[in-house]
Amino acid sequence: MVGRLYRVLSCTEYLEGKRHPAPALKLTLYNVIGERILEDQRVPIDTGYEGSIMLTSELYQAFQIAELPRTLWRNYRTLTGAITMRMARGIVEIDDMRFECFVESPLFGKGKLLIGRELLNRLTIVMDGKRKQSCIGRLEPGNNPKKFNP
């Protein structure tokens, strides 16, 4: 049997949902000139969203100073059709980690506040549905077994 041991660094309570609680992570978000735009905000996790962080149109305005050229904006396919997303650089802080990421907001429409797979794939996360918590973890040193190949 192959296993790994992780140390939990912090946990965030799930958000209340219409039918079911929603996994979330607590983050602080800065624009590239260092202005704090969100502080210790619980943001829903959406594994169906491929980008890093989606923002409402209102929040996105604080990031327009570092907006990427339109040729680099992304298009996503949804059930209702293609959506063009404006993109800018931002800085996210989750627990003791701080790194640059992309923030996006729909060119048309209001947008939502979401954490997507591009950011999630940079983290070790346990979504503990029974306890209704999303936890950030770190692999214990010297505890990285080789992949299991039967």
Task: State each model region's role.
Residues 1-150:
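Pepsin/retropepsin-fold aspartyl endopeptidases
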